Amino acid sequence: MGIVFNYIDPVAFNLGPLSVRWYGIIIAVGILLGYFVAQRALVKAGLHKDTLVDIIFYSALFGFIAARIYFVIFQWPYYVENPSEIIKIWHGGIAIHGGLIGGFIAGVIVCKVKNLNPFQIGDIVAPSIILAQGIGRWGNFMNHEAHGGPVSRAFLEKLHLPNFIIENMYINGQYYHPTFLYESIWDVAGFIILVNIRKHLKLGETFFLYLTWYSIGRFFIEGLRTDSLMLTSNIRVAQLVSILLILISISLIVYRRIKYNPPLYSKVGALPWPTKKVK
């Protein structure tokens, strides 16, 4: 059973000495598809069609940098001994939570500079973010990484998975949980839910519900993974951050409803940066 007939090479093709990996291609596809989805919501909100260009560019750029920094920080003992590895992104090692933090900060700064309402922009892009994350997890599959603990082939067959998934979860002589698939399905389900309930939510709540939904799924799926960043010997960083995001997001939804009673997302046009009251 050790022969993998449908093994997927992580490298899609080579351009001279440069290897182009499926991981990068899939991430790019996720970002582009998310952009086009957000564009439709942008136009409906009465915002200029080019509004998202700078936001996505800077959020993606600084999100990627922050994702790497975040990973390096929690693997610091290794990188102290191997400092040249810090810049070798192609060897793997980025963290989604770090990317969210960097992308969020960059997005808010661009909103401030462009006089845009960050709550409205957050609601517009939230479904696109989780869709891109769901697509991006297939990049982990192509890299044969971010999997769960050992399982039997019989277990995978009971999930009625296609053979190409089962056979590519056979890594170094062992089958593993396809946690990339669990999270991808969870994220796509979140996308479907968010785009369908957004018009019924108040301003800002779609983004906070995105954080809540993603964090719930990430908390449980992270418990299956074998490559988690660890805070201590038994505390996984991603699970701790997920709990914090759930608590913060729900608290902000309740607080804003009590304090400001923001309008429905679907009842507002293009909004400027909030000044006196956060609406």
UniProtKB/Swiss-Prot annotation:
GO terms for cellular component: plasma membrane. Coiled coil: none annotated. Keywords: Cell membrane, Membrane, Transferase, Transmembrane, Transmembrane helix. GO terms for biological process: lipoprotein biosynthetic process. It is a multi-pass membrane protein. Its EC number is 2.5.1.145. A 1,2-diacyl-sn-glycero-3-phospho-(1'-sn-glycerol) binds at R137. One of its GO terms (molecular function) is phosphatidylglycerol-prolipoprotein diacylglyceryl transferase activity. Pathway: Protein modification; lipoprotein biosynthesis (diacylglyceryl transfer). It is an enzyme of class 2 (transferase). It is found in: Cell membrane. The chain crosses the membrane at residues 18-38, 55-75, 89-109, 203-223, 235-255. InterPro entries: Lgt (IPR001640). PANTHER family: PHOSPHATIDYLGLYCEROL--PROLIPOPROTEIN DIACYLGLYCERYL TRANSFERASE, PROLIPOPROTEIN DIACYLGLYCERYL TRANSFERASE. Belongs to the Lgt family. HAMAP family: Lgt. Catalyzes the transfer of the diacylglyceryl group from phosphatidylglycerol to the sulfhydryl group of the N-terminal cysteine of a prolipoprotein, the first step in the formation of mature lipoproteins. This is Phosphatidylglycerol--prolipoprotein diacylglyceryl transferase. It comes from Staphylococcus aureus (strain MSSA476). The gene is lgt.
